[in-house]
UniProtKB/Swiss-Prot annotation:
Membrane topology summary: Peripheral membrane protein
Keyword Transport found: yes
Domain of life: Eukaryota
Protein family according to the UniProt entry: Belongs to the WD repeat SEC13 family.
Assembly: The COPII coat is composed of at least 5 proteins: the SEC23/24 complex, the SEC13/31 complex, and the protein SAR1. Component of the nuclear pore complex (NPC). NPC constitutes the exclusive means of nucleocytoplasmic transport. NPCs allow the passive diffusion of ions and small molecules and the active, nuclear transport receptor-mediated bidirectional transport of macromolecules such as proteins, RNAs, ribonucleoparticles (RNPs), and ribosomal subunits across the nuclear envelope. Due to its 8-fold rotational symmetry, all subunits are present with 8 copies or multiples thereof.
Compartments, as annotated in UniProt: Cytoplasmic vesicle, COPII-coated vesicle membrane; Endoplasmic reticulum membrane; Nucleus, Nuclear pore complex
Protein name in UniProt: Protein transport protein SEC13
GO cellular component, one term: COPII vesicle coat
Organism: Komagataella phaffii (strain GS115 / ATCC 20864)
Annotated gene: SEC13
Classification via InterPro entries: Sec13/Seh1_fam, WD40/YVTN_repeat-like_dom_sf, WD40_repeat_dom_sf, WD40_rpt
Function: Component of the coat protein complex II (COPII) which promotes the formation of transport vesicles from the endoplasmic reticulum (ER). The coat has two main functions, the physical deformation of the endoplasmic reticulum membrane into vesicles and the selection of cargo molecules. It also functions as a component of the nuclear pore complex (NPC). NPC components, collectively referred to as nucleoporins (NUPs), can play the role of both NPC structural components and of docking or interaction partners for transiently associated nuclear transport factors.
Biological process, per Gene Ontology: COPII-coated vesicle budding; ERAD pathway; mRNA transport; nuclear pore localization; positive regulation of DNA-templated transcription; positive regulation of ER to Golgi vesicle-mediated transport; positive regulation of protein exit from endoplasmic reticulum; positive regulation of TORC1 signaling
Pfam families registered for this protein in UniProt: WD40
Amino acid sequence: MVTIGNAHDDLIHDAVLDYYGRRLATCSSDKTIKIFEIDGENQRLVETLIGHEGPVWQVAWAHPKFGVILASCSYDGKVLIWKEDNGVWNKVAEHSVHQASVNSVSWAPHEYGPVLLCASSDGKISIVEFKDGGALEPIVIQGHAIGVNAASWAPISLPDNTRRFVSGGCDNLVKIWRYDDAAKTFIEEEAFQGHSDWVRDVAWSPSRLSKSYIATASQDRTVLIWTKDGKSNKWEKQPLTKEKFPDVCWRASWSLSGNVLAISGGDNKVTLWKENIQGKWESAGEVDQ
């Protein structure tokens, strides 16, 4: 396990490994992003990226077929795109359509191209494609009335390749959006009620098995699992646990294979969960801090 010492001067909000597990990006309330090279249990700070004017909430690596590219989002309402060439990092694009904090960024499945999904406290969700370092005209939709906390892409779907994503907001709702070719925008396909407080995170499982899975984590101290099999058009929900979590559930994250779910909460614990053959979710342990 790699431990990053006092790299930042304030709270660290996100830490993400790149596709190959060789680089780690961290971001913080100190307004900076740090890039580390990872070699076994050793790490070396190689760059500090400065460009945001507020806390940086999240970072996301693009697929390596697009180069060494990182996106970051901040309380300052901006999404910045950073690129490394021959060991030198530069800001290559700025996406600034939002009027309030941008709370999450995620790259689409690489088959769709370098497309970024952004969720903001201004209630809007933006989808923007980057070509040769410059952003194209973004799609901006009204997502959740009081603010959008998170959004997550669906894995590429066969045979129709319809683009979908899920979002969670301060209106306690979870929504699924589908790209409409005729309208050239994303339209609301489903809206789920299940949480009694803000939805803090949403995560669509990358698995392309017979079922689709979405995990939603909430301020109400619950995590819900939404599932849909190929035969049914209806999403079913079940709570991850019978009892509420000890504190707010901040983040939900699937393993690459989509069969293990990690939940991090306000109690500073990360718990792991797996589905059993009866379709019930069981504890798979805790991550040692």
